[in-house]
Amino acid sequence: AVLDWAVGRNVGFSKFVSLGNKADISESDILEFLADDPSTRVILGYVESIDDGRRFLRAARNVTPRKPVIVVKAGATAAGARAASSHTGSLAGSDRAYAAAFRQGGVLRAGTVEDLFDLALGFAMQPLPLGDRLLILTNAGGPGILAADTAERLGIPLAEVSAPLRARIFPALPPTSSLGNPVDIIGDARADRYGSVLSALRDEPSVDAVLVLLTPQAMTEPEETARATVSAFAGSGKTVLASFLGEATVASSRRILSEGGVPNYAVPERAVRTLYAMLRYSRIRRAAGHVTGEAPSVRPEKAERIVSETLAAGRRALGEEESRGILEAYGFTFPRHAFAGTSDGAVAAYREMGSGSVVMKIVSPQILHKTDVGGVRLDLRGEEDVARAFMEITSSVRRLAPSAWIAGVSIQEMVTGGRELIVGMSRDPQFGPLLMFGLGGIYVEVLKDVSFRVAPVSRSDAGEMVREIRSWPLLAAYRGREPADEGAIVEALMRVSRLSCDFPEIQELDINPLLVMSKGKGILAIDCRMTVAEAP
């Protein structure tokens, strides 16, 4: 089917590989081979599963600075993943891990096979845009508006039609034309009118890409307009895409465009989405070469002792004190805290911490979500509050989690201000440690506004994670509130990345909430949990 499609659209394939069940050759082998294949300019792929995700990521990082890699990943939903696993005999892995790995590896992900073919046309036929300013030329208002809407949704800026450009194209246009962007040369436009405008756009420095739209009307000349489009941009190095709408009336003109190296799309939105992918790939090439940064001030020997002792005791879940110790070894700071096994011990700990407000939390290796069992009390002030909270917490836990062993309670200085975040890590069967970042506290489960990357991450990766969440504006300055300390967040992600790579025994890690203060004032880890297992 793919080859049949290619023949009909004047796209050639240098190689066509079907891997079957990948008994001996994998997609990573093929990527590594095609990286240096001089006859291959664009790599397309249909993927159901990747057995060695980390090798694939290395291969992708090697090839994508030189050639675009465009992939359709099946099994994105739970039902699709089950079908893919059954089909290939291997685990499909989590789609969020694939999405993160593709992004880090510079792989462009097509949502459908139709998108895959659309992107293939654009990359195979046209040069990459040198900038992101798009000009839309149309003979009908509706398609131009649809294209402009899609561009705005994708963040593609429309080029300003400068005064010198207006002066060059105005003589060729009727007074009813619109010289905004889209440039609407109205429905009676023949090929010469298109040609005059396109010739002016060829060397226009304020325009990086051109989208030519045509709807067949009484006076339209589709074939001649197609030839004018090809002629105007031949050898120019400027990106030009077309959408000649219709079927039989524009069939021959589409062939002319294709033979002239101008990809044509059935509707304007598909052309704009292709341009967006080309712009993304241009940024990928410019960003190539970022190296993974090292987190400073780490003491892996302390973390190693805690992990080893936990595994030797036959436990999977670390206690809060143990989790805190590992994170402190990797440079995280916590509010002042103390452990108490009795009510009297809790009061004594409160006295030592001095006056003020404290938080009390249950300490039990069997309890990961403390609030679910009534294991947290906030804003305790005075010895009576502390003693009463100890009794209330332990009674609630005995009632709601009778099988849990209660070691005692943690008493922690109450911290106010800042924004609550979550930083976490889990291990994906294909890609290994997968970092997570998002808004913390109660918002995690409700909003699910999180971003992911495969560790190890670069500082650039970590910065993208922070700005990728929908709630990023809440971390920036707004309504008189100072911006959050983004540098400290990036540093925290780098430290968790280093920790997850240093200790494959750590299976899951959550720091929630991680309290970020205003710019320059750092972060505080408030609560944390970890699970471990013997490394494979």
Residue ranges: model-predicted function:
Residues A1-P536:
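Catalytic-core regions of core metabolic enzymes
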